Amino acid sequence: MTIYYLKPKFQGLLRPISDWLATHGVTPNMVTGTALVMSIAEGIAIWRFPTAVWPLLLLPVILFARMALNAIDGMMAREHHMQTTFGKWLNEVSDIVSDLALYAPFLVFFIGLLPKALFFMFLCCIILSEAIGIRGYRYGTRRYDGPMGKSDRALWMSVYSLSIVLLTVSGTWIFSFCYSLALYVAVWITIGRRYEGVLANMNEKRNEMERRSA
């Protein structure tokens, strides 16, 4: 299960905004760039002011806005005939860069070497997970399998950000360990599911080619 499956309903709410932007000279790449700059700015704020509360409270808002912008740029590209190869890859690269910019500063909040190491590996696995998902393009479909896709990461990092502010237990080693371990395990499950999905798509495409050549 992944929050990604709620995307069609989310897009339905945002479609009027997407249509308005498309008819007023805004391009999908502009929207993608806005989301990227916003994410980097928030990441810098968390890193620069680790003892301040406002960057942590702002993160869920920024992540929600980023998800909205990500949905809007895709709708604009598809529904208003603005799709380009450059735009597709800009979107993929900016998603990875945005995730790392937003989440890497949280290394300072995890207590103890092991939780920090687990969270660091989680960050590395984000890249692997998305790379496997992107590989799916070669076989006809981009893989968005969960349970730790982009939207899921946004949800659970928002929860962690708020827990730092609201829960004293977030400052303990056991909380840091359990949370970082859960993220790490979930992203590996995601990697496995996406890999299996890519293999299934590859075999399906191969079988289709064999049927055509028979």
Pin down the residues of each PLM region:
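Hydrophobic alpha-helical transmembrane segments
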Residues: 1-61, 101-214
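Glycine-rich active-site/cofactor-binding loop and its immediate structural neighborhood
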Residues: 52-88
